[in-house]
Amino acid sequence: MVDIATQLAAVDRGIQTMDVDGVPSYVQTLTQTYPSPIDEVWEALTSAGRIERWFLPISGDLKLGGHYQFVGNAGGEVLACTPPTGGQASFRLSWAMDPTAPTYVTVRLTGDGDHTRLVLEHVAGVEMLPPGMWEQFGPSGTGIGWDSGLLGLALHLTAPDERPDDPAAWTMTDEGKAFMRGSADAWAAAQVADGTDAAVAKTGADRTYGMYIGEVDGPWSE
């Protein structure tokens, strides 16, 4: 059994609507501290053999300037990469379902002995998202996916035997649905903190949850 309540509570979520390099953007952040040293977390995040054990199979050249592709998901380029030194590490990627509309992901690690703080920042230019996506789904449209990734990483690092054998099938169990519902609600709260009306945020969270359980078409549906 996955302790979904503990995992949901372990993540701090933020959303800001702001200009990034002069481009109107949505900036999502997720922060979690793992009970693992920075070298171990870095290896789990940057080794193809490790990544597929907690996220998705990946192909490509995982080094600065290299290109990568997750099976059935996003791909992009490694734009910056600083391995652990002095208790700090980071990397930056372009991240896109559609190569003509890239978004950007930065991951920063801060080590403190046997613990590591991870901050994931996802920057999406307003014009890079499918038309109407943000208005319909809000930050949970991508946020549930990021929450699922951090859950996978947490289980990989701390309780690998508890990771579902088939994560995709797990999302359709009562436990998996409860996790996605909790994630959607948490992102709605973060959106309200950014100034969005609570009713609008809740509607987006409800629609996103419906998308993830197959009751609502997603933004990339034909």
Predicted regions located by residue number:
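Terminal "cap-and-tail" regions of soluble proteins that handle hydrophobic small molecules
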Residues: 1-22, 123-222
